[in-house]
Swiss-Prot record:
Chief location: cytoplasm
Pfam families per record: Amino_oxidase
pH dependence, record text: Optimum pH is 6.5 with thermospermine as substrate. Optimum pH is 7.5 with spermine as substrate.
Subcellular location: Cytoplasm
Tissues expressed in: Expressed in root vasculature, leaves and stems.
Organism: Arabidopsis thaliana
Chain's role: Flavoenzyme involved in polyamine back-conversion. Catalyzes the oxidation of the secondary amino group of polyamines, such as spermine and its acetyl derivatives. Substrate preference is spermine > N(1)-acetylspermine > thermospermine > norspermine. Plays an important role in the regulation of polyamine intracellular concentration. Involved in xylem differentiation by controlling thermospermine homeostasis, and participating in the tightly controlled interplay between auxin and cytokinin that is necessary for proper xylem differentiation.
Induction, per UniProt: Induced by salicylic acid. Down-regulated upon treatment with flagellin 22, a pathogen elicitor. Induced by auxin, cytokinin and thermospermine in roots. Induced by spermine, thermospermine, N-acetylspermine and spermidine in roots.
GN (gene name): PAO5
Family statement drawn from the similarity comment of this UniProt entry: Belongs to the flavin monoamine oxidase family.
PANTHER family: FLAVIN MONOAMINE OXIDASE, PEROXISOMAL N(1)-ACETYL-SPERMINE_SPERMIDINE OXIDASE
Cofactor: FAD
Name of the protein described by the UniProt record: Probable polyamine oxidase 5
Length: 533
């Protein structure tokens, strides 16, 4: 009997379990397969949990477009899109939100919608889409776009942040004077400062979409390569983990091994040698590495390198150049329901009018929103430095900061179902309706198994780096029959392979990108062994 090829998949997240599922179901028992997971659970950056008796997502949350998404297909086929239990469905949408500027001023929807339209149009232009604006606005937007791109093209590298700034500046140049005059009913806010702050609010939301600490680090050219599925974006009623459990359900008992952290990958000999944190060693013919880009970044920089020999330059350079950020979610439980969705407009950090009681890390969150229309659980998103700071704070510090922020922005305008208002930038002790009873936060940045949330194409990198991430090792030069200068016949192919969202050129940062990457590497091995699939 021929010896089975030994395949070890590192990581039991979306990419790893997709690869394992495909290899097991399509190989006709060709492989000796195992999935080793460093943590105590499967799912990776997918982690469905419960808070206040409601289903929530600590990590991946959205199906980004239902038209053609493999994640949507699985969720639909498994009946995971409907539930009798409350979940983070986000039906209390931002379309219904109240928008408040610092100082207690509720902003007229027409003002917010105008800047929202500008920001959306600029992002659509950056992404190479046809902008969804009326004909009357197209000529003005064309002028703004041309001006913004002309200004940005003067630099060697253009970022999304610099494009957006140039676009906003061009917008202001295109309208009448009076930007520094006050806006009636908005206190010390001028029209320009108010609209600029609203624009910044939308930029902060964009930071959570991309995981970039600053949009000035996000590459402009690569933005148009990123692809999204058509259709609405939805959450999964029975939880994102239902998709993960479906993928894992076909695997025999024992294939998935938890609490098995790989500390060293020795490659370039006849077989790959994996070292584990408990001192054990496993040999494999092929290893599929699905750890996060953050773990790979740490693995090539530390004294105890993850790979031996070190990764070739083309691979390590791509790892260094690509961006990888932190996005965290904060859930707070209110003592009563019927809290409105809020959009938060903050003054500049250097403004003499800002409320100093608002902590710096709260100033770059854009929304506080109930997770569904009848929920007393509110959700805010944080990115970058603010997300990392959130991880360090105690529950009491978070409660105080959130309520101080809500109070300073809403003043006396927001009322709940008991009609008790917030007053004077602080809370009354007897205002039970506005009490936060408990909090829950994600901690993706400080978790050594992830070291962050998801990847982005940073200024100085490109889609080519994402392709380089997907290249298996050793890299074979078939034209000369050599691998890294050695005779190809003496080197085992496909020793170390790579999957995960950071290895997909057009769907990076998404669960479906991770799914496609796992499928890609499984198919690469199936083709190598001439399996019918």
């Amino acid at each position: 009997m021929a010896k089975k090829a030994r395949i070890v998949i590192i990581g039991a997240g979306m990419a790893g379990l997709t690869a394992a599922n495909k290899l097991y179901t399509s190989s006709n028992n060709t492989f000796e397969l195992s999935v080793v997971e460093g943590g105590s659970r499967i799912g990776g950056r997918i982690n469905t949990s419960e808070f206040s008796s409601e289903k929530i997502e600590m990590g991946a949350t959205w199906i980004h477009g239902i038209g053609g998404s493999p994640v949507y297909r699985i969720a639909k086929e498994t009946g995971s899109l409907v539930s009798d239990e409350p979940w983070e469905c986000m039906d209390s949408t931002i379309d219904k939100a109240k928008t408040f500027a610092e100082g207690g001023f509720e902003i007229e929807p027409s003002i917010v919608e105008s800047i929202s339209g500008l920001f959306t149009a600029l992002m659509e232009l950056a992404q190479g889409k046809e902008i969804s604006q009326s004909d009357a606005d197209l000529s003005r937007l064309a002028h703004i776009y041309e001006t913004a791109t002309r200004v940005c093209s003067k630099g060697s590298s253009t970022s999304v942040g610099s494009f957006l700034k140039s676009g906003f500046d061009a917008y202001w140049d295109s309208i009448s004077n009076g930007g520094e005059e006050g806006v009636k009913g908005y206190g010390k806010w001028s029209r320009k400062s108010l609209e600029e702050a609203i624009f910044t609010m939308f930029s902060n939301t964009q930071r959570t979409y991309t995981s970039a600490d600053e949009l000035s680090t996000l590459d402009f050219a690569a933005e148009s390569e990123y692809q999204m599925f058509p259709g609405e974006e939805i959450t999964i009623a029975k939880g994102y983990l239902s998709v993960i459990h479906h993928l894992a359900s076909v695997l025999p008992q024992g294939v998935i091994q938890l609490n098995r952290k790989v500390t060293k990958i020795e490659w370039q000999s006849n077989e790959v040698k994996l070292h584990f944190s408990d001192g054990s060693v496993v040999f494999a013919d092929h290893v599929i590495v699905t750890v996060s880009l953050g773990v790979l970044k740490a693995g090539i920089e530390t004294d105890a390198e993850l790979f031996s020999p070190p990764l070739p330059d083309f691979k390590s350079d791509a790892i260094r150049r690509l961006g990888y950020g932190v996005v965290n979610k904060l859930f707070v439980e209110m003592s009563q329901r019927k809290f409105p969705s809020l959009q938060l407009v903050f003054d500049r950090e250097d403004s003499e009018f800002r409320f100093v009681k608002i902590p710096w890390w709260m100033r770059r969150t854009a929304t506080i929103t109930p997770i569904h229309s009848n929920s007393k659980v509110l959700l805010s998103w944080f990115a970058g430095k603010e997300a990392l700071e959130l991880e360090k704070l105690t529950d009491e510090e978070i409660k105080d900061a959130v309520m101080t922020t809500i109070s300073c922005l809403t003043g006396k305008e927001v009322k709940n179902d008991t009609a008790k208002p917030l007053t004077n930038g602080s809370l009354n002790d007897d205002d039970e309706a506005m009490k936060i009873t408990k909090v829950l936060k994600s901690k993706w940045g400080s978790d050594p198994l992830f070291r962050g949330s998801y990847s982005y194409v940073a200024v100085g990198s490109s889609g080519d780096d994402l392709d380089a991430m997907a290249e298996p090792l050793p890299k074979i030069n078939k034209k000369v029959g050599q691998v890294n200068g050695h005779d190809q016949a003496k080197v085992h192919e496909l020793q170390v392979m790579f999957a995960g969202e950071a290895t997909h050129r057009t769907h990076y940062s998404t669960t479906h990108g991770a799914y496609y990457s796992g499928l890609r590497e499984a198919n690469r091995l199936l083709k190598h062994y001439k399996c019918n699939f």
